Amino acid sequence: MFKMQKYCKTATWQNLFGFINGKAGKTSYDNSYKESGRALSLRSQTWLRKKKLHCRFAAKIGGGSEMETKNFVFCFAFRSPCTIFVPKKKKMAIIPITSLQHPGVEIFSTLTEAQLRNRIEPTKGIFIAESPKVINVALGAGYEPVALLCEQKHIDGDAASIIDAHPDMPVYTGSRELLATLTGYTLTRGVLCAMRRPMAPTVEEVCRDARRVVVIDGVVDTTNIGAIFRSAAALGIDAVLLTPNSCDPLNRRAVRVSMGSVFLVPWTWITQLPGELHDMGFQTAAMALTDDSIPIDHPLLAKIPRLAIIMGTEGDGLPQQTIAEADHVVRIPMQHGVDSLNVAAAAAVAFWELRDRQG
């Protein structure tokens, strides 16, 4: 029998059937060894099904070897005893707070968005994601968590899976009233996560395989940025480029409004507009009301292989130089005397009408 460890369970049956996701079923260890025998006892079946952990089963068959499984159980038929290894859970770093001055919580309270972004040292930048759904989207996209802030009830509730997956991450918890004071608003979704800001990719990296991109020029409203990203993700935009005078997509409110879409669509900053796009073979379409603009449903636009849609603010619109340098100037036909839409609404219309129909 293999060497026992304190956190091990031991099976000493002569032969075992496999149990996969709680269902009895046969399995073979390799091409040369086939199972036979009786199933696990009911008690052992129940114990195994309750352990939603990464379990390692080591069965001494022939020379002895092992196989790892996740979230489901394989039990091998064998002719000698085996040990079931269940790794210990690391102790979670739960930190109760009773004061706004508690060390470590300043990233959720006193630091401004500019300080969190840390333009001087981008690798030290932080952003805040709110709600378990948005946090999980960020984690799934590869973003690194730094710390979690939540009400006590969420530790074993909505935030449990996040905490379990990152046992070394500090988790700050306090009363609903204290957390509302700390963050400046009531945590209706109950969970905030400070996450590491990655280095921004280059325009070439983001646009390498893209056919439809949007350029956001000077849009500073966080709600509009979040809404544009959500529409971009939903309607098939391959990448988002922003001029430096635009709002940071990882602003807390922008992330919240986007429902995590900022983590789903590649994005970066662009400084050479439209030169960098032309160098990569893109044609540009500036959204503006001019005498020579063409309607957004013009057949010519749908045939363009690589198209960059440039959008400005609702009030000031795009700079005249940007419009003059664009390959096309495009407008959305409107009725009842309305001459413009909110930039987020206009973006949704443009993304749908100018979507890639060839891919």
Q: Which ranges hold each PLM region?
A:
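Short, positively charged and aromatic/hydrophobic N-terminal segments
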Residues: K3, Y7-K9, Y29, Y33, ...
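Amphipathic alpha-helical repeat scaffolds
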Residues: S131, V220-I228, L341-A346
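A glycine-rich helix N-cap at a beta->alpha junction
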Residues: P167-G184
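Active-site/ligand-binding-proximal alpha/beta "capping" segment
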Residues: A286-V338
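Structured adenosyl-cofactor binding patch, chiefly the S-adenosyl-L-methionine
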Residues: C193, S231-L235, P244-F263, Q320-G359
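Boundary-proximal intrinsically disordered activation/regulatory segments immediately upstream
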Residues: P87, M92-Q152, C247
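RNA substrate-binding interface of SAM-dependent RNA methyltransferases
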Residues: G140, V171, R196-D292
